[in-house]
Regions:
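Beta-propeller-forming repeat regions
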Residues: 1-336
């Protein structure tokens, strides 16, 4: 990556998420501490401040089918101070924003939306249901379902579909059994969402080791996703597994320091893994495959002393980007 472009300067930036809405690709970014939230347009470089934020932003996502509606999780402050956290609805009218707390959800951390048959299902995960102090992990988190099509946006109702995952931290979109789905992770492993014939949602086990974050990508071109993990919680190890049909076989392992912000994608048509270190070198790093069977990868530093919290690999037009929320430098950055 030859070019670094600082697109936003945000104190204690935590969230940085790129997504397409209609013809445009946007980046939503926000602070872990301050009431600073912005929407950045890739094609024009235009920045719009999303007003009404209390700070403590963990996630910012678009609502499919509505180009002017977005959902976020805010109110979770370091270190896991989140009794007032919740889901927020952001509506855009021309250049103005209207933000409302849609659901009080203590210790909310991650959210994603699945669209099935034209209906939007919002899933929100909490790291815990209650914490006496930041080190208290005695209570598992919850996974909540909100059917957005059944709401007016004024008052949401949620249904708990799981309350068994301790240190419920990771969430990512992927495809399993031919369907787009969401995976969540924690001490008990990785689980994915499945909808039965009656329309009910449940979680199913995919991997049975403690995982902080995960991403899925076809590294060797055989048409099957490999599993890339940070282990354990906020862990010290990056692992890559291949699914042999009966088990996940580890093919590569390397050290991290407070691993965070794991993502994967393609740069110049080649698979790449991107991950941050939130202690030690604080480096933003990439891993490129040389030989998966032999467990050989090229590890490179994208930027030292960045302290990344979230990263993403994506393409816009003819350009491949790495997006990173470099909290150490208070910057949301594009590399290309």
């Amino acid at each position: 990556m030859n070019t670094k472009q600082v697109i936003l300067e945000i104190e204690s930036v935590y969230t940085a998420n790129a997504f397409r809405v209609g013809p445009e690709i946007y980046i939503g970014a926000g602070s872990e501490t301050k009431p600073e939230v912005y929407l950045y347009t890739i094609t024009t470089g235009e920045t719009s401040q999303v007003t009404g934020s209390p700070g403590g932003m963990m996630s910012f996502i678009p609502v499919p089918g509505n180009p002017d509606m977005f959902v976020s999780i805010m109110g979770l402050f370091p270190p896991f101070v989140g009794g007032e956290a919740g889901l927020f609805l952001h509506r855009r009218t021309n250049r103005d924003w209207h933000t409302t707390r849609a659901l009080h959800l203590p210790f909310a951390h991650r959210c994603e939306i699945l669209n099935r048959d034209g209906k939007n299902f919002l899933f929100a995960a909490t790291v815990s249901t209650y914490k006496e102090n930041p080190q208290d992990w005695s209570n598992p988190g919850e996974l909540h379902l909100i059917k957005l099509d059944d709401t007016t946006g004024a008052s949401w109702e949620s249904r708990v579909i799981d309350n068994s995952i301790t240190r419920n931290h990771g969430m990512t979109r992927t495809r399993i059994n031919g369907h787009e789905t969401i995976c969540i992770s924690g001490r008990e492993g990785i689980f994915y969402l499945e909808q039965d014939a009656g329309g009910d949602w449940r979680i199913k086990s995919l991997f049975e080791k403690e995982v902080s974050e995960m991403t899925f990508i076809d590294l060797d071109g055989d048409g099957q996703y490999e599993l890339v993990t940070i282990e354990p919680f906020h862990g010290e190890t990056l692992n890559i597994y291949k699914n042999t049909g009966s088990e996940w076989d580890i093919r590569f392992s390397d050290s991290l320091s407070f691993g965070h912000g794991l993502s994967s994608g393609f740069v110049k048509q080649k698979p790449v893994i991107v991950v941050g270190n939130r202690s030690g070198s604080m480096a933003l790093e990439s891993f490129h495959i040389l030989d998966l069977k032999g467990g050989k990868f090229n590890r490179a530093v994208i930027e030292e002393d960045a302290g990344p919290t979230q990263t993403q690999v994506f393409s816009a037009g003819d350009t491949d980007y790495v997006l990173s929320a470099n909290q150490r430098k208070n910057e949301a950055v594009l590399y290309y």
